[in-house]
């Protein structure tokens, strides 16, 4: 949750027995209700771009669902896009104005396969370009470090978080 804002972050399951059109239509109806309720409570609604139990997580879905719902935001994590083979810089360029919260988690792929999510700044993500695009779009929301590595545990994980803090401090303007 952002310090300045109350945000409810959610996804939307895909129903295999329905068409993509039907899934999008039901998702829009669902999010419309959440947005209306959120406005009553001063809470902004955001989708997350993780693919687990959620189909509203890529440029195609954003174009339809977020394109229609102007008050639906995005909690963004570059690693989810990278690990799914997407273009996180393109998604940021096209949808970054709707990003309300950002996770900082590294992503490393080897031979086209997900290897690990090491500390942000020790990975393959072009963080300077990502942050440059975000700042250029006026982003001033939260940045949350999300340690989620198969290899970085305990004290090593703590040192990785410290590294990420130092790494991103140099990009804060």
Regions found by a protein language model. Give the residues of each.
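Histidine-acidic metal/acid-base catalytic patches
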Residues: 5, 36, 56-76, 82-173
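Active-site acidic/histidine proton-transfer and metal-coordination neighborhood
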Residues: 4-73, 83
């Amino acid at each position: 949750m952002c310090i300045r804002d109350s945000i409810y972050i959610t996804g939307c399951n895909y129903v295999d027995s329905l068409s993509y059109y039907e899934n999008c239509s039901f998702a829009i109806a669902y999010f419309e209700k959440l947005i209306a309720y959120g406005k009553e409570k001063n809470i902004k609604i955001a989708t997350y771009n993780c693919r687990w139990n959620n189909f509203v997580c890529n440029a195609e879905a954003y174009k339809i669902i977020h394109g229609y719902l102007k008050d639906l935001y995005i909690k963004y994590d570059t690693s989810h896009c990278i690990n799914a083979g997407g273009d996180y810089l393109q998604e940021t360029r096209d949808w970054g104005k709707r990003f309300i919260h950002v996770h900082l988690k590294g992503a490393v792929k080897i031979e086209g396969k997900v290897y690990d999510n090491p500390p942000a700044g020790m990975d393959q993500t072009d963080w300077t370009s990502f942050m440059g695009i975000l700042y250029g779009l006026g982003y001033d929301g939260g940045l949350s470090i999300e340690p989620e590595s198969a290899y970085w545990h305990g004290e090593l994980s703590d040192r990785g978080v410290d590294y990420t803090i130092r790494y991103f401090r140099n990009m804060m303007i």
